[in-house]
Amino acid sequence: MKLSCGTSFAFLLLFLLAAQSVHVYAGSFHKDVQIHWGDGRGKIHDRDGKLLSLSLDKSSGSGFQSNQEFLYGKAEVQMKLVPGNSAGTVTTFYLKSPGTTWDEIDFEFLGNISGHPYTLHTNVYTKGTGDKEQQFHLWFDPTVNFHTYCITWNPQRIIFTVDGIPIREFKNPEAIGVPFPTRQPMRLYASLWEAEHWATRGGLEKTDWSKAPFTAFYRNYNVDGCVWANGKSSCSANSPWFTQKLDSNGQTRMKGVQSKYMIYNYCTDKRRFPRGVPAECT
């Protein structure tokens, strides 16, 4: 299946020196993921494994994880979020490594009361430290139809796209002493859970459990990545994807989205960083 993370930058051409370690997954939830928590609240709805739902009630949320770990790659999924009053709920699609000094790349969708927009929260963690938040209000209602969300992760940068449009690029800042996720393989995760103490207006809006169960849908899960196997994942430095970046059109589109729809950027939060914004922001 053709991946559709975006037309504004070249597709990643991922391969390993050991050919058996290269995998392109065409999106079967039956084969490629396991619903690892939720006690039946996560369900695969079709024989081909293309459609999966996660539900949340007052007792528990639910989630799934990929069967494979990846060290670099491109992952996408189509999502349709919880409709109506979703205050206090968090729906996610993200990459994460295990352990106490984990790496993580986040798409998190923070619910809201009826008639108010979701907040799309993005973040990057390295060695257990994040604090690199950018947040957006989407230019569409993400509860009406499915929309495509994609993470592209390579040694130079991480690119977040929505329906093929880049909304964020986080470049590798190791040259200035800022960590970047380059060494820890990550699994893909998705979840629906309750965080009413902070998710909606800083916790002012609480979850209305009379509306439960809350349900989000995922379909057309795709991964093109370097699979971590036998303790290593050796990708060829001669591959063009090592130097891929947004072209001028991609940069223009991203800046347009950020100017219209970004509602928070840690790089401009001088109150939070009174002694100066983080080094990668300058």
Swiss-Prot record:
Induction of the gene: Up-regulated by auxin and brassinolide. Down-regulated by aluminum.
Active site residues of this protein: 104, 108
Tissue: Root specific. Expressed in all cell types in the elongating and differentiating region of the root.
One GO MF term attached to the UniProt entry: xyloglucan:xyloglucosyl transferase activity
Cell compartments where the protein resides: Secreted, Cell wall; Secreted, Extracellular space, Apoplast; Cell membrane
Covalent S-S links between cysteines: 226-235, 267-281
InterPro entries xrefs: Beta-glucanase/XTH (IPR044791), Beta_glucanase (IPR008264), ConA-like_dom_sf (IPR013320), GH16 (IPR000757), GH16_AS (IPR008263), XET_C (IPR010713), XTH (IPR016455)
GO biological process: cell wall biogenesis; cell wall organization; xyloglucan metabolic process
Alphabetical keyword list: Apoplast, Cell membrane, Cell wall, Cell wall biogenesis/degradation, Disulfide bond, Glycoprotein, Glycosidase, Hydrolase, Membrane, Secreted, Signal, Transferase
Modifications after synthesis and translation: Contains at least one intrachain disulfide bond essential for its enzymatic activity.
Entries under PANTHER family matching the protein: XYLOGLUCAN ENDOTRANSGLUCOSYLASE/HYDROLASE PROTEIN 8-RELATED
Function: Catalyzes xyloglucan endohydrolysis (XEH) and/or endotransglycosylation (XET). Cleaves and religates xyloglucan polymers, an essential constituent of the primary cell wall, and thereby participates in cell wall construction of growing tissues.
The name this protein goes by in its record: Probable xyloglucan endotransglucosylase/hydrolase protein 17
Organism: Arabidopsis thaliana
